[in-house]
């Protein structure tokens, strides 16, 4: 199931930091041979209110066992130690032990990057240990498993968290007979597989109204627990185990910081978090101690907003009066999303696809940051499905550039819709790239004990040089991983970045394109992923303080490298890395140019995940319904018909049963709690049966060297109970079965059925009964529900069957009674499911005709099949031959995707006898009797696939090819196409506006097989005559092809001339525009110059007037000062005169007083005065007595 293609050889850069690659091979092998062992722990004791956990043999999280050819580097030493250790943990994925140095990992880490051949890659990886525990016994494992869904009434398909099985990207298929778990190579591939299986079970999913339940939950931390102990949590939904946290040591608080997200859940009542204390590793037989639980009613966390609270832990034995008990902080949100049939969203989706820019501009000012994130996510997913995401991101980025103007440093540093959109798109299409580029590096960093703290205030000066060397080594390693990941860079991101570069160049700002690309990729994706690996699903565990500090410093250096900036005075302690930054700037520029180069688009794989378009449209509708209600009426009027469309969808959602299309059944309803009683999950099944079932981990052969990670976890039927468990592993360098042209098995799953319709009573309709005209009516391709099915086994495939009869209509039942209905294969186009020898890509399956234009599983044209159908000479002859040999055609249709002469592997029932994949094939079975009156005896020797009776498993009829069997593959690879390029044919084709329907594809397949029959068996009994006829036909066909090619050449020449003329006209128009703009520019410059001269003259006049006014003011000031001085002199003189007058007045008053006294004395004595005294005033104002003269 793993995505792949041909292995690419990654070439490391010949940089100075590959010095450690010169270490001797023996030393590197010793480094790789170190291993760690983890003691086993068993399930915790059962307490009242607690649920039983998994048995002691369930493996902990296990890394990938094969080196991915698409990953440039591998931490081989680290993986060696992990894989060689026993796989015995039960409770969680604990913090990786820090018992060795990161430098010990480095040689193997880099030697894997420098490996140039696949055999050297396989040599680096060790063989998995056969025995997992003391109770393991080797038992024969099934190489091929069959999953028969033909008679199942209830099938539950759900993902399995990596903490449960110890394996990434697993999903579980639960039927009435048990559960099977499958492992894929990436989350996108797992989602695609699950969706295809769901469509096999519910083909009418997109035409039915459905409800989806989504839970997002964070287990953040716990408090009031005893210190120096490790604790972990188990997450149960309605008492079914869904996930575990890692084991964390109690310091101040127990901090987990782990988030879980679950989709397609049944309706939930309660969410329960069980708390455990981990026991000592040395005490192997002790169980983990159960402490208690936290129960959250689903209704308490329902809604669009997250609910974050401290919840008390309910313990089995509460301790009264001793303070508060332990508490856990949990953040959760439970959503119920109602999804209408796709037809109801048609107008809404078309409007969003064509008017996204105006919508974003209108809503940007009123949305909160969280709402912007949710809306950007929905828009990106919808436009990715409709093929408009590149235009959407380019338009948003250019509007962001226009908004920021000259402030380029603000781009992608604000919470805008453009920033959130590129974040969501990077997470959508870049998850596997992120895992390939940095996954193993981050895991090795978690494992290492290197200290990279270089802040002098946080470490001693003696340790500073060593820490600086550690940080430089880690940064070199991280950047080396990043720049060598260009070979696995997502094709969609290359297209977007190339579009940005082209748009910036057309706007005359080519320099800003580099900033756009580096800011989006590093600032919003790679650097946050380095700082917080758990948020980007690189690892489940939140890093401890030292690792978090190391990751932060690496992210700082990487971000400065992407910004082409040095460390300054703000972080002077990091200045020692400036030399590294300068040295790597050139490589960073080369990397940015490589990932935006449109010429290398065909060298990378595209996005292969699944997008639930109905769910995204429903989420976007709810967001827009809430946001548009907050807009002003003037803004709403600019949105066109969007408010009316939103009202229509809201009305359909509010009306029960309004979303049900006529003639359809609600097959996509989520199974309720009662349905989970069939199988509540693999873990619960194992526990309730007291380990009586047999669990097998079996690695299947892969079609490419990369496809090594497919596992089946099965439970036996209970006929032969055994407590034993086994693990089988196929080494990468073990010899595979030699097949034709060196190819291996073709695909991993085939969902094609032989659809039967009940005909006359008592007359069974076999799978060989095909329409005589070679066509299947389009109405017969609609999927309903079956009565019977005939599972067909393809060699080496894990097959899934679901029989679906066609609704009986007058046009089909009367015109062709008893005809079977043949549905197109429901497999999706993924290059890894096709042979590397140039086999044609199988068309995408059709769940229903109404979802072709909206679902991500919509059909695409198959160029090889259409070309093969177009080259047939006579359609009528083909139809007649088809009517004569329907049985042979039916068998050849099943083998259409296989190469001739391939030895194949029989499919086996999980309860039947099992055989290793490397055992020799059994003898071919005798051919079955031919249908009466249908197949000539001469064709019996060519029958390859004898079909079992309806309802039986294919293990009773092995599919080994018998001697003399001849199969031909009609594909374009026979015309000289390269085998390596053929699996990528799907990605090279652009989105076609009109995809062929199921009728056209079916006719193309049947006609292609008819041509093969005509070529193999011939039409006449005379071989020489047939050869001559064939040569004449080939000659005439070659002449026709030559004439067609000549016509195409003439048309191409004419179009080229037209394009040249158009280009010349455009060039002349552009030249005129350039000249016009140049003249306008010169005119504007002249106008500005004149304005500047006028302003200069005005300024000179103003200055001269100011100077004259200043002189006048100076003169006035001098005159005023002189006047003030003269006045001051007068004032001084007057003051002196006043003083003298005051003195004279005083003397006069004294003289008057004396005279008055003399007169008064004389009057008393009676003496008359003689010679009265005369006073005279002198010139000085003094009085003088005249008698004294």
Curated annotation (Swiss-Prot):
What PTM annotation applies here? In response to TNF-alpha-induction, phosphorylated at Ser-728; phosphorylation leads to a conformational change, and thus, increases its association with 14-3-3 proteins, MAP3K5, RIPK1 and TRAF2 in endothelial cells; also stimulates regulatory p85 subunit sequestring and PI3K-p85 complex activity inhibition.
**Listed Basic residues bias regions:** 20-38
The protein's UniProt keywords, in alphabetical order, are: Angiogenesis, Apoptosis, Cell cycle, Cell membrane, Cell projection, Coiled coil, Cytoplasm, Developmental protein, Growth regulation, GTPase activation, Immunity, Inflammatory response, Innate immunity, Membrane, Phosphoprotein, Stress response, Tumor suppressor, Unfolded protein response
What Pfam families is this protein classified in?
A: C2 (PF00168), DAB2P_C (PF12004), PH_RASGAP (PF25321), RasGAP (PF00616)
Biased composition, class Low complexity, residue ranges: 669-679, 852-865
The record gives the membrane topology as: Peripheral membrane protein
| GO molecular function list | 14-3-3 protein binding; death receptor binding; GTPase activator activity; mitogen-activated protein kinase kinase binding; mitogen-activated protein kinase kinase kinase binding; phosphatidylinositol 3-kinase binding; phosphatidylinositol 3-kinase regulatory subunit binding; phosphatidylinositol-3-phosphate binding
Which parts of the sequence carry Phosphoserine? 728, 747, 978, 995
Give the Ras-GAP domain ranges.
387-595
Q: Which residues form a coiled coil?
A: 1025-1159
Site Arginine finger — annotated at 413
Induction comment: Down-regulated in prostate cancer and medulloblastoma.
Q: How does it assemble?
A: On plasma membrane, exists in an inactive form complexed with TNFR1; in response to TNF-alpha, dissociates from TNFR1 complex, translocates to cytoplasm and forms part of an intracellular signaling complex comprising TRADD, RIPK1, TRAF2 and MAP3K5. Interacts with DAB1. Part of a cytoplasmic complex made of HIPK1, DAB2IP and MAP3K5 in response to TNF-alpha; this complex formation promotes MAP3K5-JNK activation and subsequent apoptosis. Interacts (via N-terminal domain) with JAK2; the interaction occurs in a IFNG/IFN-gamma-dependent manner and inhibits JAK2 autophosphorylation activity.
Task: Return the domain comment text from this UniProt entry.
Answer: Exists in a closed inactive form by an intramolecular interaction between the N- and the C-terminal domains. The proline-rich motif is critical both for PI3K-AKT activity inhibition and MAP3K5 activation. The PH and C2 domains are necessary for the binding to phosphatidylinositol phosphate. The Ras-GAP domain is necessary for its tumor-suppressive function. The C2 and GAP domains constitutively bind to MAP3K5 and facilitate the release of 14-3-3 proteins from MAP3K5.
Entry protein name: Disabled homolog 2-interacting protein
């Amino acid at each position: 199931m793993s995505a792949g293609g041909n292995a690419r050889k990654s070439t490391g850069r010949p940089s100075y930091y590959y010095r450690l690659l010169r270490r001797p091979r023996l030393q590197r092998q010793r480094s790789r041979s170190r291993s760690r062992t983890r003691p086993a722990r068993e399930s915790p004791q059962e307490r009242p209110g607690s649920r039983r956990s998994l048995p002691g043999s369930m493996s902990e999280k296990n890394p990938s066992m094969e080196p991915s050819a698409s990953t440039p580097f591998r931490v081989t030493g680290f993986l060696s130690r992990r894989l060689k250790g026993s796989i015995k943990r039960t409770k969680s994925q604990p913090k990786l032990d820090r018992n060795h140095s990161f430098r010990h990992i480095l040689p193997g880490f880099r030697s894997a990057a420098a490996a140039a051949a696949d055999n050297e890659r396989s040599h680096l990886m060790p063989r998995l240990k056969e025995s997992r525990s003391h109770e393991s016994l080797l038992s024969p494992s099934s190489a091929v498993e069959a999953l028969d869904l033909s008679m199942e009434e209830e099938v539950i398909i759900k993902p399995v968290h990596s903490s449960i099985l110890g394996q990434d990207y697993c999903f579980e298929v639960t039927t009435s007979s048990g559960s099977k778990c499958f492992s894929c190579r990436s989350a996108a591939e797992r989602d695609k597989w699950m969706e295809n299986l769901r469509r096999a079970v519910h083909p009418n999913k997109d035409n039915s109204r459905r409800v989806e339940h989504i839970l997002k939950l964070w287990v953040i931390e716990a408090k009031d627990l005893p210190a120096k102990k490790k604790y972990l949590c188990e997450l149960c939904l309605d008492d079914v185990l869904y996930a575990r946290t890692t084991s964390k040591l109690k310091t101040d608080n127990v901090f987990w910081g782990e988030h879980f997200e679950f989709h397609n859940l049944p309706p939930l009542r309660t969410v329960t978090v069980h708390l455990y204390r981990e026991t000592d590793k040395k005490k192997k037989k002790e169980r983990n101690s159960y402490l208690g639980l936290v129960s959250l009613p689903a209704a308490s966390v329902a809604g669009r907003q997250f609910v974050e609270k401290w919840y008390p832990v309910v313990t089995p034995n509460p301790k009264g009066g001793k303070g508060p008990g332990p508490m856990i902080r949990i953040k959760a949100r439970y959503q119920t999303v109602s999804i209408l049939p796709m037809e109801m969203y048609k107008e809404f989706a078309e409007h969003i696809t064509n008017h996204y820019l105006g919508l974003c501009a209108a809503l940007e000012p009123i949305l909160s940051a969280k709402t912007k994130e949710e809306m950007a996510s929905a828009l990106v997913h919808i436009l990715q499905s409709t093929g408009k995401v590149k235009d959407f991101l380019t338009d948003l980025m250019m509007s962001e550039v226009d908004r920021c103007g000259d402030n380029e440093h603000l781009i992608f540093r604000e919470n805008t819709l453009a920033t959130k959109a590129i974040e969501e798109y990077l997470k959508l299409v870049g998850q596997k790239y992120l895992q390939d580029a940095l996954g193993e590096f981050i895991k090795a960093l978690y494992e290492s004990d290197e200290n990279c703290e270089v802040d002098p205030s946080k470490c001693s000066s003696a340790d500073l040089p060593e820490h600086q060397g550690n940080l430089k080594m880690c940064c070199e390693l991280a950047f080396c991983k990043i720049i060598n990941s260009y070979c696995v860079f997502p094709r969609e991101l290359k297209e977007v970045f190339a579009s940005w570069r082209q748009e910036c160049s057309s706007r005359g700002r080519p320099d800003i394109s580099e900033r756009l690309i580096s800011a989006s990729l590093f600032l919003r994706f790679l650097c946050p992923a380095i700082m917080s690996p758990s948020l980007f699903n690189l690892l489940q565990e939140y890093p401890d303080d030292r690792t978090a500090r190391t990751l932060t410093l690496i992210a700082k250096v990487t971000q400065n490298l992407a910004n082409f900036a040095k460390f300054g005075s703000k972080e002077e302690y990091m200045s020692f890395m400036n030399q590294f930054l300068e040295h790597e700037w050139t490589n960073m520029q080369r990397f940015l140019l490589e990932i935006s180069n449109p010429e290398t688009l065909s060298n990378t794989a595209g996005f292969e995940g699944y997008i639930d378009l109905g769910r995204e449209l429903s989420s976007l509708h709810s967001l827009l319904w809430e946001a548009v209600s907050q807009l002003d009426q003037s803004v709403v009027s600019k949105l066109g018909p969007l408010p009316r469309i939103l009202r229509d969808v809201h009305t359909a959602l509010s009306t029960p049963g309004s979303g049900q299309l006529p003639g359809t059944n609600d097959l996509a309803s989520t199974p309720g709690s009662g349905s989970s009683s069939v199988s509540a999950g693999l873990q619960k099944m194992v526990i309730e049966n007291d380990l009586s079932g047999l669990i097998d981990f079996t690695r299947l052969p892969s079609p490419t060297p990369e496809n090594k990670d497919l596992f089946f976890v099965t439970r036996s039927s209970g006929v032969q109970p055994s407590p034993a468990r086994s693990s089988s592993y196929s080494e990468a360098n073990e010899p595979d079965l030699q097949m034709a042209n060196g190819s291996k098995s073709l695909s991993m799953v085939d969902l094609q059925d032989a659809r039967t319709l009940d005909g006359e009573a008592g007359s069974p309709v076999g799978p060989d009964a095909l329409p005589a005209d070679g066509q299947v009516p389009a109405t017969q391709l609609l999927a309903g529900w079956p009565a019977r099915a005939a599972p067909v086994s393809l060699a080496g495939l894990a097959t899934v069957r679901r029989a679906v009869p066609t609704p009986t209509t007058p046009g089909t039942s009367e015109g062709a009674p008893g005809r079977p209905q043949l549905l197109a294969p429901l497999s999706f186009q993924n290059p890894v499911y096709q042979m590397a020898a140039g086999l044609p890509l199988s068309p995408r399956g059709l769940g229903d005709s109404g979802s072709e234009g909206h679902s991500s599983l919509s059909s695409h044209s198959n160029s090889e099949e259409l070309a093969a159908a177009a080259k047939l000479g006579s359609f009528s002859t083909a139809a007649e031959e088809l009517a004569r040999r329907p049985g042979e055609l039916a068998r050849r249709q099943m083998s259409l995707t296989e190469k001739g002469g391939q030895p194949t592997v029989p499919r086996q029932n999980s309860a039947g006898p099992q055989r290793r994949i490397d055992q020799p094939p059994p003898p071919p079975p005798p051919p079955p009797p031919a249908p009466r009156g249908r197949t000539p005896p001469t064709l019996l020797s060519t029958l390859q696939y004898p079909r079992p009776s309806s309802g039986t498993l294919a293990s009773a009829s092995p599919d080994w090819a018998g001697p003399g069997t001849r199969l031909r593959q009609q594909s374009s690879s026979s015309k000289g196409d390269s085998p390596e390029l053929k699996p990528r044919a799907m990605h090279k084709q652009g989105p076609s506006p009109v995809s062929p329907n199921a009728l056209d594809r079916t006719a193309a397949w049947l006609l292609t097989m008819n041509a093969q029959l005509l070529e193999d068996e011939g039409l006449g009994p005379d071989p020489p005559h047939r050869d001559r006829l064939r040569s004449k036909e080939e000659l005439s066909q070659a002449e026709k092809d030559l004439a067609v090619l000549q016509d195409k050449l003439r048309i191409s020449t004419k179009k080229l001339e037209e394009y040249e003329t158009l280009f010349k006209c455009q060039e002349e128009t552009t030249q005129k525009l350039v000249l016009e703009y140049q003249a306008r520019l010169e005119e504007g410059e002249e106008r500005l110059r004149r304005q500047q001269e006028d302003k200069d003259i005005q300024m000179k006049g103003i200055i001269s007037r100011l100077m004259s006014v200043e002189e006048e003011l100076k003169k006035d000031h001098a005159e005023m000062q002189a006047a003030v001085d003269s006045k001051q002199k007068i004032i001084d003189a007057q003051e002196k005169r006043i003083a003298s007058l005051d003195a004279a007045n005083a003397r006069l008053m004294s003289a008057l007083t004396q005279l008055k006294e003399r007169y008064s004395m004389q009057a008393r004595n009676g003496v008359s005065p003689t010679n009265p005294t005369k006073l005279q005033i002198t010139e000085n104002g003094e009085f003088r007595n005249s008698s004294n003269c």
